[in-house]
């Protein structure tokens, strides 16, 4: 691994800059390079230094102008420069954010990275409207599932397990 961590996979949370972690806010402001998704709110992008290099890699349903392998290559290329690089992702990088794929690609290329968690969309939305994801006596757990998988694979969900009345079910895009 290279000496110091200069690549950070940062969760931007649900869009409100006040809901960023202190570390996420600091890294976004200090970053020399910001590689960001379409789901990152414009209010959060305003925190990025005007001197930073910004690279948009946003994806939409069935439209990926920058495929994941190219995003991985970008991260590795910027890691090689030694510049402080933030990979800014909506929500949390490890909740359907492909952060684990990006971290693995960096590590396989010999670069360490640090994960900075963010508030997930499910957490932010439930808190905003006052409906808890768990509640003693009602919901003893939370289950996150995706409604989509890789295009070459069928969606294979445990429908019976998902019907557990004691578990809150959160379905992501």
Feature map (PLM): residue ranges:
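Class I S-adenosyl-L-methionine
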Residues: 1-17, 22-116, 124
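Proteins with a high burden of low-complexity, intrinsically disordered sequence enriched in S/T/G/P/A and R
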Residues: 20-25, 30, 136, 160, ...
